[in-house]
Swiss-Prot record:
<keyword id="KW-0687">Ribonucleoprotein</keyword>
<dbReference type="InterPro" id="IPR020783">
    <property type="entry name" value="Ribosomal_uL11_C"/>
</dbReference>
<dbReference type="InterPro" id="IPR020785">
    <property type="entry name" value="Ribosomal_uL11_CS"/>
</dbReference>
<dbReference type="GO" id="GO:0070180">
    <property type="term" value="F:large ribosomal subunit rRNA binding"/>
</dbReference>
<comment type="function">
    <text>Forms part of the ribosomal stalk which helps the ribosome interact with GTP-bound translation factors.</text>
</comment>
<dbReference type="InterPro" id="IPR036796">
    <property type="entry name" value="Ribosomal_uL11_N_sf"/>
</dbReference>
<dbReference type="GO" id="GO:0003735">
    <property type="term" value="F:structural constituent of ribosome"/>
</dbReference>
<dbReference type="InterPro" id="IPR000911">
    <property type="entry name" value="Ribosomal_uL11"/>
</dbReference>
<keyword id="KW-0699">rRNA-binding</keyword>
<dbReference type="Pfam" id="PF00298">
    <property type="entry name" value="Ribosomal_L11"/>
</dbReference>
<dbReference type="InterPro" id="IPR020784">
    <property type="entry name" value="Ribosomal_uL11_N"/>
</dbReference>
<keyword id="KW-0689">Ribosomal protein</keyword>
<dbReference type="GO" id="GO:0006412">
    <property type="term" value="P:translation"/>
</dbReference>
<dbReference type="InterPro" id="IPR006519">
    <property type="entry name" value="Ribosomal_uL11_bac-typ"/>
</dbReference>
<comment type="subunit">
    <text>Part of the ribosomal stalk of the 50S ribosomal subunit. Interacts with L10 and the large rRNA to form the base of the stalk. L10 forms an elongated spine to which L12 dimers bind in a sequential fashion forming a multimeric L10(L12)X complex.</text>
</comment>
<dbReference type="GO" id="GO:0022625">
    <property type="term" value="C:cytosolic large ribosomal subunit"/>
</dbReference>
<keyword id="KW-0694">RNA-binding</keyword>
């Protein structure tokens, strides 16, 4: 028989740098999960993606066991890295902070495709372009 799911916890943690300190500790502690076991397993799984923020979905079961699924980094993080900027623009329509090529957009869209609500790469590219525009990043050919 399948285990009963008690909670699904979603967090965004830097790859390979999870610690029992907030936000991880309190989020998992309230469900009685072994925090150190999660931290150790998460850091092992994400060690090769150092420097990126990795969203993770943790499913907590009735017997206090857990499973987790890592997702692809947020589109905004990938765009910031591609444009070589620290943060997006506070006034995206007035002040542009960087440029990204369509080829880079396609690369990001292909990486994010499995996590996006899109059927093909073209639709995913349009979503990523929209994110870029809202951050004040110019999309050039």
């Amino acid at each position: 028989m399948a285990k009963k799911v008690v909670a699904v916890v979603k967090l965004q943690i830097p790859a390979g740098k999870a610690t029992p300190a907030p936000p991880v500790g309190p989020a998992l502690g309230q469900h009685g999960v072994n925090i150190m076991a999660f931290v150790k397993e998460y850091n092992e799984r994400t060690a090769q993606q150092a420097g990126m923020i990795i969203p993770v979905e943790i499913t907590v079961y009735e017997d206090r066991s857990f499973t987790f699924v890592t997702k692809t980094p947020p589109a905004s993080d990938l765009l910031k890295k591609a444009a070589g900027i620290e943060s997006g623009s506070g006034q995206p329509n007035k002040k542009k902070v960087g440029k990204v090529t369509r080829a880079k957009i396609r690369e990001i869209a292909e990486l994010k495709l499995k996590d996006l609500n899109a059927n093909d790469v073209e639709a995913a590219m349009r979503m990523i372009e929209g994110t870029a525009r809202s951050m004040g990043i110019e999309v050039v050919d």
